């Protein structure tokens, strides 16, 4: 029996990144031998065991052969005669096909070290094409390591295109697509994930609502980048700088979906694109089974981001109604989330990356004023039932009006 550290732990250590999880491969052993040594078996489809002390995963060396369509139909073979090189060959990228023995020596049969040094994401073998999930994984790795200068090897991108055009991605379940997307949204450059999907044709298959935005023009006066698809990726990049929250980043990604519905004869203007985009947000989220909380914020951002841009023009009643519409009284975090997504929208434009966004400050200030109106005082004044809400709203509007006159007067 020989044990090797494999995969991501070696890759990240060589890149100087924190190592979160360590995975091990066991060569020349059997399930019974692992159980006799005190390991606990956890894998159903192939032999994976937990170490009795560290609880890290130890997998018997195995090979995989595609036996059907999609990414789940694989026949696994795990036996003592499977070599380390055999096991590493089934992995997706060369930088993940590295192993390290107990002396610290790195085994690199597929030039993963060279690709790591050259910042290349390259597939190990043609077997890459048997698993459509790998298209998403490579896009996610591209986003994760973009800040280090990584790019996808030409031959790998070509293979990803071939897989997409062959219809392989249609076998992916919504849950897996969302899981990879959610992981990509946590990276430093989530926009790279969607750009890679577009480069290989997968965006049109998995995110047609986003793909439809490319080639749709917006007024050059407000959008020097012109193309709404490019603007969408720029806003996502900006959102990633402003917030680590997946729901903020996803909502920003979806904020302009309604522009994809504008008839070409009305271009480059997109009146009413916000409310129009709400149905597309719901459609996308239902298809990918996006969690409700993330979906709900995306709907609100699509509907109200343009309203927040015009904040100085809003009367106090409209401002308080906005807080009602986003359910801010029960979910106050939505005010901050709307401020951040709207700021990302404004700064996600060519030449506006460092722009100030006072509307965000005014939104936050107006919220502090509105929520500081005490409910207790209304009740103590003798109001009852529905009168309480009506009087509370009236007082909130009055408080916001007083604040607005001093801090955010309506332009002449």
Curated annotation (Swiss-Prot):
Binding site for CTP: 8, 11, 91, 137, 140
A Pfam family assignment: HD
Highest taxon above the source species: Bacteria
GO BP annotation list: RNA repair; tRNA 3'-terminal CCA addition
Record-level Gene Ontology MF annotations: ATP binding; CCA tRNA nucleotidyltransferase activity; cyclic-nucleotide phosphodiesterase activity; magnesium ion binding; phosphatase activity; tRNA binding
Entry's EC annotation: 2.7.7.72, 3.1.3.-, 3.1.4.-
SUPFAM superfamilies: Nucleotidyltransferase, Poly A polymerase C-terminal region-like
InterPro entries: CCA_bact (IPR012006), HD/PDEase_dom (IPR003607), HD_domain (IPR006674), NT_sf (IPR043519), PolA_pol_head_dom (IPR002646), PolyA_RNA-bd (IPR032828), tRNA_CCA-adding_enzyme (IPR050124)
Catalytic activity of the protein: a tRNA precursor + 2 CTP + ATP = a tRNA with a 3' CCA end + 3 diphosphate; a tRNA with a 3' CCA end + 2 CTP + ATP = a tRNA with a 3' CCACCA end + 3 diphosphate
Annotated ranges, domain HD: 228-329
Co-factor binding details: Magnesium is required for nucleotidyltransferase activity.
Stretch forming the signal peptide: none
CDD domains: HDc, NT_ClassII-CCAase
Transmembrane segments: none
Xref: HAMAP family: CCA_bact_type1, CCA_bact_type2
Subunit structure: Monomer. Can also form homodimers and oligomers.
Family: Belongs to the tRNA nucleotidyltransferase/poly(A) polymerase family. Bacterial CCA-adding enzyme type 1 subfamily.
Note: A single active site specifically recognizes both ATP and CTP and is responsible for their addition.
Domain notes: Comprises two domains: an N-terminal domain containing the nucleotidyltransferase activity and a C-terminal HD domain associated with both phosphodiesterase and phosphatase activities.
Function according to Swiss-Prot or TrEMBL: Catalyzes the addition and repair of the essential 3'-terminal CCA sequence in tRNAs without using a nucleic acid template. Adds these three nucleotides in the order of C, C, and A to the tRNA nucleotide-73, using CTP and ATP as substrates and producing inorganic pyrophosphate. tRNA 3'-terminal CCA addition is required both for tRNA processing and repair. Also involved in tRNA surveillance by mediating tandem CCA addition to generate a CCACCA at the 3' terminus of unstable tRNAs. While stable tRNAs receive only 3'-terminal CCA, unstable tRNAs are marked with CCACCA and rapidly degraded.
Name listed for the protein in its UniProt record: Multifunctional CCA protein
Organismal lineage: Bacteria, Pseudomonadati, Pseudomonadota, Gammaproteobacteria, Enterobacterales
Gene that produces this protein: cca
């Amino acid at each position: 029996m020989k044990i090797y550290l494999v995969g991501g732990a070696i890759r990240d250590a060589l890149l100087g990144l924190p190592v979160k999880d360590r995975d091990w491969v066991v060569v020349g052993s059997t399930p019974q031998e692992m159980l006799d040594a005190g390991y606990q078996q956890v894998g159903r489809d192939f032999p994976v065991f937990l170490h009795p002390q560290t609880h890290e995963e130890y997998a018997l060396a195995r090979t995989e052969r595609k036996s059907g369509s999609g990414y789940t139909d694989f026949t696994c073979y795990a036996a003592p005669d499977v070599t380390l090189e055999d096991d590493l060959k089934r992995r997706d990228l060369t930088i993940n096909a590295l192993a390290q023995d107990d002396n610290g020596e790195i085994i690199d049969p597929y030039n993963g070290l060279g690709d790591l040094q050259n910042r290349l994401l390259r597939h190990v073998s043609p077997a890459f094409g048997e698993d459509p999930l790998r298209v998403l994984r490579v896009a996610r790795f591209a986003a994760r390591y973009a800040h280090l200068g990584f790019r996808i090897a030409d031959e790998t991108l070509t293979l990803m295109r071939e897989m997409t055009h062959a219809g392989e991605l249609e076998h992916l379940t919504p849950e897996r697509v969302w899981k990879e997307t959610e992981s990509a949204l946590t990276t430093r450059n989530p926009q790279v994930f969607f750009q890679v999907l577009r480069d290989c044709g997968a965006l049109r298959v998995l995110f047609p609502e986003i793909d439809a935005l490319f080639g749709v023009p917006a007024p050059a006066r407000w959008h020097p980048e012109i193309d709404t698809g490019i603007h969408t990726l720029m806003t996502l990049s900006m959102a990633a700088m402003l917030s680590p929250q997946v729901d903020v980043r996803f909502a920003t990604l979806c904020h302009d979906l309604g522009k994809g519905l504008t008839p070409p004869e009305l271009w480059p203007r997109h009146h009413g694109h916000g409310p129009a985009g709400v149905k597309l947000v719901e459609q996308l989220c239902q298809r990918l089974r996006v969690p409700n909380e993330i979906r709900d914020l995306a709907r609100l951002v699509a509907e109200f981001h343009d309203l927040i841009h015009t904040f100085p023009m809003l009367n106090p009643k409209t401002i308080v109604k906005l807080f009602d519409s986003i359910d801010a009284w029960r979910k106050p975090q939505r005010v901050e989330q709307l401020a951040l997504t709207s700021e990302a929208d404004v700064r996600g434009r060519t030449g506006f990356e460092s722009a100030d966004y006072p509307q965000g400050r005014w939104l936050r200030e107006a919220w502090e004023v509105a929520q500081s109106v005490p409910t207790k005082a209304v009740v103590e004044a003798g109001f009852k039932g529905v009168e309480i809400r009506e009087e509370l709203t009236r007082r909130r509007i009055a408080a916001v009006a007083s604040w607005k006159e001093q801090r955010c007067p309506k332009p002449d």
